[in-house]
């Protein structure tokens, strides 16, 4: 029996995902039909990105799960028409990549790197940034990726604060939650 997998990503993301998803599915030995357009009553699974235009899941009566391409699911989790299980993507590569990207940009701003790169006018700028321990960094969102970034920055000596919807306790990070904590 063929498993019907509907891909609903953001604009132009089909070109990026079609081949890798097809290759991964072939390795499973599963008989499948992966496409951007499948009749709702035939869909077994939806591969989904919150940037897609799909926001009504009611017609997908046979759908067993929505497989989110992103770690963040805050834009879909409250959708009343989403009655099937929802998964989110978290893998070590995504986490490591996000940690590197965030750390790089925090250090870029902390050290004032842009002033040195852009200021190629021959004038020496003797600006000395504060030590990391004297700089506060706040992470808004303490999901898997946010916690990984926050703990890395705390490990570099930054004073780190973090906010989440629900209470969390994270070593070396001052945490706040809910509307009152924002």
Region roles according to the model:
Residues 28, 61-62, 80-83, 156, ...:
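Short, structured coil segments at secondary-structure junctions
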Residues 44-119:
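Phosphate/diphosphate ligand-binding glycine-rich loop within oxidoreductases
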Residues 31, 85, 159:
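Residue-level detector of anion-binding/catalytic polar loops
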Residues 128-182:
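Rossmann-like dinucleotide/phosphate-binding beta-alpha-beta segment
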């Amino acid at each position: 029996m063929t498993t019907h997998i509907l891909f609903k990503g953001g604009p132009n993301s089909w070109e990026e995902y079609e081949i890798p998803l097809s290759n991964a599915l072939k390795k499973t030995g599963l008989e499948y039909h992966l496409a951007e357009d499948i009749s709702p009553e035939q869909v077994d699974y939806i591969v989904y990105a919150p940037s897609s235009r799909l926001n009504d899941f009611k017609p997908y009566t046979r759908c067993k799960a929505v497989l989110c391409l992103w770690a963040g699911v805050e834009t879909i989790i409250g959708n009343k028409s989403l009655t099937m299980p929802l998964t989110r993507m978290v893998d070590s590569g995504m986490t490591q990549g996000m940690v590197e990207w965030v750390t790089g940009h925090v250090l870029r701003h902390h050290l004032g790197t842009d002033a040195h790169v852009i200021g190629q006018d021959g004038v020496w700028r003797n600006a000395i940034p504060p030590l990391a321990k004297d700089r506060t960094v706040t992470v808004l969102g303490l999901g898997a990726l946010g916690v990984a970034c926050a703990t890395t920055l705390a490990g570099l000596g930054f004073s780190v604060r973090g906010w989440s919807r629900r209470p969390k306790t994270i070593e070396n990070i001052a945490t706040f939650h809910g509307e009152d904590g924002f």
